[in-house]
Structure formats: C-alpha cells, structure tokens
C-alpha cells in the first residue's frame, strides 16, 4: 500500500474523505473540482503575460521555453511565443500557487499529514500552443519519476491545475489508472516525424492501444497524481492556447536524493546536466571547469513550501 506506516488511506484526512484517499491509493490520481478560485488564476495568467512581454523581470533561474514548431513560426514575441515556463519558484506571484492552502492541504493528505514539511521541487506554467499539423504540442506517455533523483516515490505528488477549460480538443491530460503501482520504465525520445521538444521523453515501446482516461477539466479544477503514474497529453487541435499551472511536491521529512547512475534515468540526467552547464555562462562561469551531479540541479530548484528545509 502507498505510504505504508505514514499515510492511512482507509481513513479520512484533514481535507479528503476516506473514499477520495482510497481512490488515489488505487488509481494513482485524484481530481478535485474548483480547487483554485478564478481570481487566483487571473493573477497567475496576468503574471505569465507580464513575464512573456518582459514587463517584469523573470528570475534568473527560470526557464522560458518555445515549442519547436513555434520557434519557426510567426509567433516571435509575447505570450504566443512561449509554450512553457519552468522553475518559477523564485517569482513571488507564481509561487503563491505552490503555497495555496487548497492545494497544499490536499497534497499533505496524500503524501503526509498536516505537520509534514513540503518542498516544491518542480514548477511549470504550460501554455500549450495550437498544433500546426506536426503534432509537436502533444506530450508522449511518460512517468514523471524519470526526471527526479529523489525517493520514495510514494511521497512525491504533482498538483496540476487547469487555468481554463481543458478538453480532448485542446489536449487534456490522459492517465492510465493503477500504473503507479508498477515500476519506472525505460524512457527515450519518441521517433515522431514532426520532431519532439527538448526533454519530452516517453516510455520505450509504449503500447498506444492501452486504455486511458481523458481528464477534462474546468478552470480551477486540479488533478493530483503519483510520479509513477503513466500519463501524457494530446495535441492542441484548437486555435487557442491551453494553460495549466503545476507543482511537484515532495515530503521533505521522508524523501532523500539518490544516485541515478547505472539506472534507466542516467541518460536523461546527463542531458539535463549538460543543459545546466550551458546556463552557467550567464554567470560568467566556464562550464568545463564545473562539476555537477543530477541532485545538485534539484537542490537549486527546490523551495520550502512550509516548515524548515532539511533533506532536499
């Protein structure tokens, strides 16, 4: 059972009912309707626009990404040119999402208790662009643990909030219930004709006929899911952009960094380390003289949500 000895999924939590906790334990995800109010979403949307239009200075460690199709399209500047921002934990407005009580209290019920110290490990605001026919806006089926050098997986949880109506048409999340009880599978870049965005790894030889659930959402709805749950998202076949905001949390009382050398994560870790080294030039450092390991990168990213940082 998930969280054995720490979380009792047969009992109600501070926020969640026993039925909701059992659903998460069985399926690896839980959808909470109206979790984040519209006025908060409006603030996050405005902040994203201000960052894209350079009306406010983005934190130095924030990553601003373009879809490979956008990089070659008519969208050169502003909100329509950006497909995602990552590592927004040092932005005072966007980080309020990670600390929003309606989200944090659910996470604590799933991977800890009311006194648990949580860390925000990975943050994203996704602006999925309209697909130009090459299907580059889709995300291959994957497991988030592929990217994380910390364990145990049962004490990591993603909160993913819709900032607008999200449907199959504009590329909602798809999940394969129960797969969180399996293991981390080997990942690689999909061999897609239209190309694949940087670090968009997918499960090797994945059977696309496997039944899946499409998680359609209204603004403010939030899906919480386990890092081994197999999931992905479809292409955005509408003319508009599709926004969502997310944070991966880890229970800092229980999680520790692990060495991924010699595992299925090693290749991706090397790729991310190389990306990080290239960014060191921003600070006047020679990347060839700096030694980094995968855990170092995550230590820099991680931020306290509550309590005092201890292990991560």
UniProtKB/Swiss-Prot annotation:
Gene3D superfamilies: q2cbj1_9rhob like domain. 2-oxoglutarate binds at residues 84, 124, 142-144, 160, 233, 242. Its cofactor is Fe cation; L-ascorbate. The keyword Oxidoreductase applies. It comes from the Eukaryota. Pfam families: PhyH. Fe cation binds at residues 142, 144, 231. It is an enzyme of class 1 (oxidoreductase). InterPro entries: PhyH (IPR047128), Phytyl_CoA_dOase-like (IPR008775). It catalyses: phytanoyl-CoA + 2-oxoglutarate + O2 = 2-hydroxyphytanoyl-CoA + succinate + CO2. The keyword Membrane does not apply. Pathway: Lipid metabolism; fatty acid metabolism. Keywords: Dioxygenase, Iron, Metal-binding, Oxidoreductase, Vitamin C. Its EC number is 1.14.11.18. Belongs to the PhyH family. Converts phytanoyl-CoA to 2-hydroxyphytanoyl-CoA. This is Probable phytanoyl-CoA dioxygenase. It comes from Caenorhabditis elegans. The lineage of its organism: Eukaryota, Metazoa, Ecdysozoa, Nematoda, Chromadorea.
């Amino acid at each position: 059972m998930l969280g054995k000895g720490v979380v009792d999924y047969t009992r109600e939590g501070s926020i969640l009912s026993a039925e909701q906790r059992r659903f998460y334990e069985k399926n690896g995800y839980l959808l909470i309707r109206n979790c984040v109010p519209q006025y908060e979403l409006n603030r996050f949307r405005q902040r994203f626009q201000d960052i894209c239009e350079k009306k406010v200075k983005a934190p130095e460690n924030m990553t601003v990404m373009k879809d490979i199709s956008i990089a070659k399209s008519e969208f050169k500047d502003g909100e329509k040119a950006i497909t995602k921002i990552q590592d927004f934990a040092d932005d005072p407005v966007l980080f309020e999402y990670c600390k929003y009580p309606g989200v944090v209290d659910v996470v604590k019920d799933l991977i800890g208790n009311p006194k648990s110290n949580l860390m925000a490990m990975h943050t994203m605001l996704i602006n999925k662009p309209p697909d130009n026919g090459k299907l580059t806006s889709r995300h291959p089926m994957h497991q988030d643990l592929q990217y994380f050098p910390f364990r145990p997986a049962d004490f990591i949880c993603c909160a993913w909030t819709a900032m607008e109506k999200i449907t199959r048409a504009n590329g909602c999340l798809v999940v394969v219930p129960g797969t969180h009880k399996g293991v981390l599978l080997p990942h690689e870049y999909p061999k897609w004709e239209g190309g694949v965005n940087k670090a968009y790894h997918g499960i090797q030889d994945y059977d696309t006929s496997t039944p899946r659930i499409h998680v359609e959402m209204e603004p403010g709805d939030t899906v919480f899911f386990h890092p081994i749950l197999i999931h992905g998202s479809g292409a955005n076949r509408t003319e508009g952009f599709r926004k969502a905001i997310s944070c991966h949390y880890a229970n800092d009382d229980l999680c520790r960094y692990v060495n991924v050398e010699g595992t299925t994560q090693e290749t991706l870790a090397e790729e991310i380390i190389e990306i990080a080294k290239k960014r060191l030039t921003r600070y006047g450092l020679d990347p060839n003289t700096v030694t980094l390991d995968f855990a170092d990168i995550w230590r820099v990213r991680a931020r306290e949500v509550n309590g005092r940082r201890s292990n991560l």
